[in-house]
Structure formats: C-alpha cells, structure tokens
Amino acid sequence: ALEANFVGYDDVLAMCRNAEKFGSDGDLSNRHAERLANEYLKILRDESKPYAEKYGIILMPSIQSDTHNIKMGECFGASADGRLSGQPFSQNSRPQFGSCSKGLTGMLGSLLHLPFRGFASGSLNLDVQPAMFAGEKGEKLFENILKTYFDNGGLHVQVSCQDVNELIDAQIHPENHRDLTVRVTG
C-alpha cells in the first residue's frame, strides 16, 4: 500500500488515517513517540561521543525542521500514518497535520510525553484562531493552558493568532495591514 501511495488500497488508507495518532493524547501513540524520541537521543549520544572526545564537539539535539518539513515530505514516499507521497511532514515538534483529534489540550498532552530535557530545541508552532480565546476569559484560559504546558516540561511555543479573513484581506489590500506580521519560522 505504501509503495503504491495507497492507490487501490482505500481500505488500508482509511485504517491508517483512523488509527490513534500522536497528538490525540492516546496512551499507545504517546508511548511510541516517547520510545522513538528516547531512541533518537540515544543514537545521537552514541554516534557523537567519539567527536566529543576527539574534538570537544557537543551535539545539541533538537526536534526541529523549520520549513524543511515541506521539502523533506516532497522527497519521501507515503507513510503509515496516511500521509501521501510528497506531502509535508509535521513541522518541528508539532504532531502531524490532522492528527490532533482531541484539540489543543490533547496535542499538548501528547507533547509532554517527549523527553524535552534531552533536547536543546523543539519548537511548537501553534496556530490558534483569535475567536478561540477572545475576551478577558479567553486570554486567561490561553495563559493557563500555556502555563500548565510549561510547568509540566513543555519546551518552546511560537504562537500565531490570525483570523483567516484578515489574512485574505491582507493579500487583497496590503496597504491596510502594514503592521500584520506573519511568521513562518524563527
């Protein structure tokens, strides 16, 4: 199915896309992500040890792709999570697009299973709609969600909070949105 990019394997593609994913705060997917991240750290430590001893190089591992997730996705075939050949990988520490079936708190709950103490960087690019956290109550809720995330070991969050209609209008009338900042990375 993967080699065929799921062509002719609609049933397998549906099973892959409906399986529990990292980002939904499910036990199985969280355990797999934690295991893989720990294995990644172990491999990096083991492989970099000779260079550290010989040259004094200190490896600073990260869960980071910046915008390379798009180019990397273009170079790889389909994957067992239901991502088709050529589609982007997830960006930085963010779970794969479409996998956060339990919303923001489910995504953050999954991320807290990663061993962030072993990583120098692992930015989460978080896109939220302004209406989700409107008003004083909404702002306080968002503050509490982020505070809880960081208090429990979360590493780094870059928040983008723009209304889709505002972005569309900015494309049509850029002169009316000179102070609008759209951050892609960094």
Regions found by a protein language model. Name each.
Residues 1-186:
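Acidic, glycine-enriched catalytic cores built around paired aspartates
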